[in-house]
């Protein structure tokens, strides 16, 4: 719960990939079944020649050369049957005849001694695969924890290079060199690149229309289906007050609602509107930051009440909430405020339209994990969602000087189709309160300044 980087990393990589014309799906806090369904939806966006990119930040491990992403509901200790195998996802992407497959894995690669299975995933020789591991084999990945807005170590340097018009392996080589000069993690974390890329492929390559133009159009519509925001609306009350509701997307499964009074009678001395059906301690705050909206705060209109709804993938019915208006008039004296209410239905916003909460539907992702000698088996009954990963015992690390307060990094992802998975720490349906998830707005781009700050007071947090 105390970790901050994954949500920030996913948000910033999402914006960078969009600048490169990627269709990005960015998701936080997914259970196993939600992750499998999200992968299936991601695969629907792929076809011949498409560049597919998946970024993941969070709990993970590596056994026998296979990497495993850990969902938020994985038991402790977890096994491969509770996780998603990255190589299994790659095999499914290969079946789509993608032009480039890029995996950026921002997670630890330590062995999981609770998992003794030996995967046997046979991949095709496609000469278009690039892996960028945030750390070396059998090592940990870190985020730098401080009082300021912060990235994980990998993304801190990746975001400065991602838009470079260079072959993707050249970009990652330069990121590795930058990370190697960062004193805070030197000797503890080093980027590892694995590639079978035989052509010059860059994330900046222009999008071209080929034989699959019609198919690409269909896939773009499929992506748009899960990223349409509710239209802003005006609510008029009998007392003469008019309220405007606006909506913004922080991630594919996080919605921001802002409420603003645009008109009221001249003799109304007090007027306030807020959303019911949500926890008032978490919602209807007067600044975005109070409600946990740190990343969008600068682009939202001012002088509103703000509400943040996360984990939209769990929404089973249409989203209906009540707007309550309170007001007093000059003629009322000391009488209590009058209340008016209106019900609002915004159907299923953003990723909620895809019903990722259902049991695994298309068996593509699951079947790949069920190959002979595969580490996975049928997941059985769906686990109840836990809000946070359970951290293992880190007592063995606490003896390291200057690197205390060690905790695991939560799950995050971006993906061109680009897909970021993110394991932030906000609970289902409600935003985190400022005390539990405090992320400032701006990030420093000055590496030297960051080094000085972190060398003086550094907390390394492995994933």
Annotate each PLM feature:
Residues 1-463:
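Cysteine endopeptidase catalytic domains of the caspase/legumain-like
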């Amino acid at each position: 719960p105390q970790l901050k980087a994954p949500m920030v990393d996913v948000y910033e990589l999402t914006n960078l990939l969009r600048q490169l014309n990627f269709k990005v799906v960015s998701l936080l806090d997914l259970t196993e079944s939600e992750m499998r369904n999200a992968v299936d939806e991601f695969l629907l966006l792929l076809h011949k020649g498409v560049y597919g990119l998946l970024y993941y930040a969070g709990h993970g491990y590596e056994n026998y050369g296979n990497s495993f992403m850990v969902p938020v509901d994985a038991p402790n200790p977890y096994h491969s049957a509770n996780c998603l195998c990255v190589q299994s996802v790659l095999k499914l992407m290969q079946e789509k005849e993608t032009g480039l497959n890029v995996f950026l894995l921002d997670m630890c690669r330590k062995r999981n001694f609770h998992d003794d299975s030996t995967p046997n995933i046979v991949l095709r020789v496609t000469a278009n695969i690039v892996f960028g591991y945030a750390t070396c084999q059998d090592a940990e990945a870190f985020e730098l924890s401080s009082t300021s807005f912060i990235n994980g170590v990998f993304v801190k340097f990746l975001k400065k290079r991602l838009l470079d018009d260079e072959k993707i392996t050249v970009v990652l080589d330069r990121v590795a060199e930058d990370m190697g000069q960062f004193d805070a993690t030197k000797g503890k974390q080093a980027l590892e690149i694995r590639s079978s890329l035989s052509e010059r492929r860059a994330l900046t390559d222009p999008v071209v229309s080929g034989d699959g133009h019609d198919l690409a159009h269909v896939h773009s519509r499929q992506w748009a289906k899960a990223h349409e925001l509710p239209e802003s609306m005006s609510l008029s009350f009998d007392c003469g007050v008019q309220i405007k509701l606006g909506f913004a997307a922080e991630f594919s499964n996080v919605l921001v609602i802002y409420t603003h009074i645009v008109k009221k009678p001249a003799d109304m001395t007090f007027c306030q509107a807020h959303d019911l059906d949500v926890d008032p301690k978490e919602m209807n705050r007067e600044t975005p930051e109070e409600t946990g909206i740190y990343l969008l705060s600068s682009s939202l209109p001012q002088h509103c009440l703000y509400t943040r709804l996360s984990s939209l993938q769990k929404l089973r019915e249409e989203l209906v909430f009540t707007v309550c208006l309170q007001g007093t008039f000059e003629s009322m004296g000391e009488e209590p405020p009058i209340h008016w209410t209106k019900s609002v239905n915004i159907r299923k916003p953003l990723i909620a339209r895809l019903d990722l909460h259902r049991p695994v539907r298309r068996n593509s992702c699951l079947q790949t994990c069920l190959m002979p000698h595969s580490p996975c088996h049928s997941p059985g009954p769906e686990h109840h969602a836990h809000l946070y990963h359970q951290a293992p015992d880190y007592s063995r690390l606490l003896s390291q000087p200057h690197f205390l307060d060690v905790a695991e990094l939560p799950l995050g992802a971006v993906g061109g189709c680009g897909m970021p998975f993110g394991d932030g720490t906000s609970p289902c349906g409600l935003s985190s309160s400022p005390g539990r998830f405090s992320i400032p707005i701006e990030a420093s781009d000055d590496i030297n300044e960051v080094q000085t700050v972190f060398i003086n007071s550094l907390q390394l947090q492995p994933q």
